[in-house]
Regions:
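Nudix hydrolase/Nudix homology domain
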Residues: 24, 61, 73, 100-102, ...
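A residue-level structural signature of the nucleotidyltransferase/glycosyltransferase Rossmann-like core
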Residues: 7, 46-47, 134-135
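A glycine-rich, hydrophobic loop/mini-helix early in the fold
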Residues: 35-67
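A structural signal for short, well-ordered beta-strand segments
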Residues: 38, 67, 98, 114-116
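Acidic, metal-coordinating catalytic segment for phosphate/diphosphate chemistry
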Residues: 2-37, 41-43
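The catalytic Nudix box helix
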Residues: 48-49, 66-98
Length: 169
């Protein structure tokens, strides 16, 4: 990722109110920006997680959502989800299903996250400078690891929200 990329700044409802550089968005929690997450399940209902490269500026070496990335300027969230699937895991032609939106905020940033799912069992092609490894996990395996420090804070929040969503269905 290039530090000078710019992305849209949005209000809590997703209405575009401006643009800002990536570095600004990742250092000012008052600037909300859009990201997409795609939870990739296989046919056995196991969830794919990626282990972030140790070179990443956020959550290096931690297990994280299957796919996650910024929404480009002028891009809709479904297109962003499909692009990120292709860029991060080499997945093309996978149908994505929208689940929910939520705000994620910490000391560095605030994201308006749009979460999708898709079913794909592999193979996966990924850039080893970005992603150290991928593997499928059972829901129980993830639950055991949530407080271990091995999973990114972003994904802990995502997984807890997904669990509540899944219980309501």
């Amino acid at each position: 990722m290039h530090q000078e990329e710019s992305f849209e700044v949005v209000d809590p409802n997703g209405k575009v109110i401006g643009t800002a550089r990536r570095a600004e968005l990742h250092s000012n929690p008052s600037l909300i920006h859009r990201v997409v997450h795609v939870l990739v399940f296989n046919l056995q209902d196991l969830l794919l997680l990626q282990r972030r490269s140790h070179n990443k500026d956020t959550a290096p070496g931690k297990w994280d959502t299957s796919v996650g990335g910024h929404v480009d300027i002028g891009e809709d969230i479904r297109s962003a989800a499909l692009r990120e699937l292709r860029e991060e895991l080499g997945i093309e032609g996978c149908s994505v299903n929208f689940l929910y939106d939520y705000l994620f905020s910490n000391r560095q940033e605030t994201e308006l996250v749009s979460t999708f799912t898709c079913v794909h069992s592999g193979p996966f092609r990924f850039n080893r400078e970005e992603i150290a490894a991928v593997r499928f996990w059972s829901i129980d395996e993830i639950n055991v690891q949530l407080d271990s420090g091995k999973i990114s804070d972003h994904f802990v929040e995502e997984f807890r929200r997904y669990g509540k969503f899944r219980c309501r269905r």
